[in-house]
Amino acid sequence: MNSRVLFGSFVPVDSVLHRLDPRLKLVTCFWYVVIIFFAKGPLTYLLLVAMLGAMIGLSKVPLKMYWAGLKPLLWVIGLTIAIQVLFSSGGHVYWHWGLMAITSGGINQALVILARFILIVLASTVLTATTPPLRLADAIESLMKPLKKIKVPVNQIAMMISIALRFIPTIMDEVNTIVKAQQARGVDFTSGSVYTRVKRMVPIMVPLFVGAFRRAEDLAVAMEARGYDPDQERTRYRQLTWRRPDSIALAVVVIVSVLFFVARILL
């Protein structure tokens, strides 16, 4: 098994979460992200963490793989926290200099954003790690099927999402390959000013975009050679079927959601 998992990567292991209907997992993930923004106070966040911990445990994907998937985003998290801490107002002022100030309100907002960011990323990673891209695309198409009545191109949207999810880990792997190649040539991405570091990213971005366009063109040629027609209804080898474990999982999600909103109201 690969030692890391990135958003968009499917990890083929046998687990309860892998066997659930992809439509249920997709709706649950979407609902989980929505209620994150309704969280208020330690108790509601504790429920969210417990729910996410249960999903991670049921997925049977090692924790170090989730950490490896979250690690590349640490700089985004750090930058977001720094902006919130230095430029948010409210509460007791601990330090002040010009437009920047460290306040209790800014620290609280930074912690909330940090918690939301990590929960959203990990929940999305659980979804993509336990659901193959094609099954996820089928789930999206199935859930969006009523929109066909108003002429929404559901098939094309589902295919685009499937391709995007498939390309995310591929592009990330290509970034790692290019970075290692540049480092082997003596390029140091960790030293120097911000401008210098950004300038050193150019040798990464150019081959990355060239490779992405080349892969997209190859994929388009392959799909055309196989007779893909976006206007035709696709057939599926594996049909989506709702089973008893899916109903049990849905009931658990509903119960946890009720507990979440009860805890929020009582705060």
From Swiss-Prot:
* Disulphide-bonded residues: none
Principal localization? membrane
Q: What molecular function terms (GO) are annotated for this protein?
A: transmembrane transporter activity
Membrane-crossing segments per the record = 30-50, 67-87, 110-130, 152-172, 247-267
Q: Where is this protein localized, as stated in its record? A: Cell membrane
Assigned GO CC terms: plasma membrane
Tell me which PANTHER family the record gives: PROTEIN ABCI12, CHLOROPLASTIC (PTHR33514:SF13)
Q: Which family does it belong to?
A: Belongs to the energy-coupling factor EcfT family.
Subunit structure as annotated in this protein's UniProt entry: Forms a stable energy-coupling factor (ECF) transporter complex composed of 2 membrane-embedded substrate-binding proteins (S component), 2 ATP-binding proteins (A component) and 2 transmembrane proteins (T component). May be able to interact with more than 1 S component at a time.
Q: What is this protein called?
A: Energy-coupling factor transporter transmembrane protein EcfT
* Species of the source: Limosilactobacillus fermentum (strain CECT 5716 / Lc40) (Lactobacillus fermentum)
Which lineage?
Bacteria, Bacillati, Bacillota, Bacilli, Lactobacillales
